[in-house]
């Protein structure tokens, strides 16, 4: 490491934003497990006017430089909805990538100073930029590429963040299992019981009614997750924005809604691991990769599928009915995933480490933890 000092400067220009996004390619250029994100999506995430998150939040981005070379980046953000749901004075930082400990210390100190100036008394991180984007630092599973919409980090970051005085706030866990040969007599009996119950209907979504289905699912999500740690509601604008991004990877057979007496009470969203389809694009969609990706998405056959979101109406939490609906949705989706999409591995998560209800579902026979992410906190 050079003895030259680290300087921190805010991201101001379009050129700065490009450098901020492109820096990840320098950090992970020799990491075979890293999957380059689509640059257009990262630019959209951090740009006011594109990401509706900025309608209720503000963020500052910085670059760390040494001798004219970029050696780190970070964001700090204040979200009005986080204030409402996680406590007044709660600020966050994220988008954290560095080449060395000196840059890490300087960037974290800078982010903390900005948060204090905004009146924050507590920092959570890394969260990039909200709980619905990429929360947490990967602390287990570095050797395996992340699935769609999950982060990947250098093992050294854990020590750097803890050296800055941060302690664990919460761990987020993902599980994986071989979905080709999954069977369990107890679960099979529960599913059979549900199939005999005429009140229950498990249906696929209808993509031709995409906006209507998206609103239904996200309303269920806001109800099902509202008591969870870290929960912040999605606004109507964010629902539309998320729907637009997710639409190309939504397939009728992979998204299920459970109804009881005609009322939607649970859902499960499963997506192909788009990282398998984009890794060789190196983050670039244009001019030719866009067509290549569209072709791959016509009928994607990925080895891995991910369940990023699953929820059961709050009124059914801790009931036998909740488990029954969950396992019915899992089984019906599993069958189609294997038969129609050629999938062999399923990933559930992320799941809060203390969400016993979801953990009891995710800990299926043969399932194991494949990634663990940690959100840290510190009093300012």
Predicted regions and their residues:
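TRNA-binding/sensing appendages of the translation machinery
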Residues: 2-44, 112
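Acyltransferase donor/substrate-recognition loop-hinge adjacent to the catalytic core
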Residues: 3-6, 151-230
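Catalytic cores of nucleotide-enabled group-transfer and carboxylate-activating enzymes in metabolic
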Residues: 14-17, 36-40, 44-48, 55-73, ...
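A conserved beta-strand-loop-helix scaffold within acyl/acetyltransferase catalytic domains
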Residues: 24-66, 76-84, 204, 209-312
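Alpha-helical subdomain
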Residues: 50, 78-81, 279, 360-363, ...
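Acyl-donor binding region in acyl/amide transferases
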Residues: 83-165, 281-364
């Amino acid at each position: 490491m050079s003895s030259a000092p680290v300087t921190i400067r805010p991201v101001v220009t379009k050129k700065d934003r490009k450098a901020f996004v492109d820096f990840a390619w320098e950090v992970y250029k020799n990491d075979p497990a890293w999957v380059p994100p689509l640059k257009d999506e990262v630019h959209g995430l951090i740009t006011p006017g594109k990401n509706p998150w900025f309608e209720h939040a503000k963020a500052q981005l910085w670059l760390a430089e040494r001798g004219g070379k970029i050696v780190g980046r970070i964001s700090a953000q204040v979200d009005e909805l986080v204030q409402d749901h996680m406590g007044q004075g709660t600020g966050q930082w994220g988008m954290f990538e560095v080449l060395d400990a000196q840059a890490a210390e300087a960037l974290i100190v800078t982010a903390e100073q900005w948060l204090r100036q905004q009146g924050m008394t507590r920092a959570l991180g890394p969260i990039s930029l909200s709980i619905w984007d990429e929360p947490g630092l990967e602390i287990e599973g570095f050797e395996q590429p992340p699935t769609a919409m999950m982060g990947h980090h250098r093992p050294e970051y854990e020590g750097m963040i803890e050296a800055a005085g941060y302690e664990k706030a919460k761990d987020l866990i993902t599980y994986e299992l071989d979905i080709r040969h999954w069977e369990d007599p107890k679960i099979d009996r529960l599913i059979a019981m549900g199939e005999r119950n005429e009140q229950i209907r498990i249906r696929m979504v209808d993509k031709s009614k995409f906006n209507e289905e998206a609103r239904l699912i996200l309303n269920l999500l806001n109800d099902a997750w509202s008591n969870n740690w870290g929960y912040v509601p999605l606004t109507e604008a964010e629902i539309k924005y998320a729907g637009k991004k997710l639409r190309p990877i939504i397939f009728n057979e992979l998204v299920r809604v459970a109804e009881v007496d005609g009322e939607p009470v649970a859902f499960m969203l499963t997506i192909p691991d788009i990282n398998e389809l984009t890794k060789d694009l190196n983050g670039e969609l244009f001019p030719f990769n866009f067509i290549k990706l569209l072709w791959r998405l016509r009928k994607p056959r990925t080895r891995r599928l991910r369940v990023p979101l699953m929820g059961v109406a709050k009124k059914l939490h801790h009931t036998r009915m909740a488990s029954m609906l969950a396992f019915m949705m899992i089984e019906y989706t599993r069958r189609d995933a294997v038969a129609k999409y050629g999938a062999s591995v399923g990933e559930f998560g992320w799941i809060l480490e203390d969400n016993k209800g979801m953990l009891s579902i995710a800990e299926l026979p043969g399932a194991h933890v494949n990634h663990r992410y940690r959100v840290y906190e510190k009093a300012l």
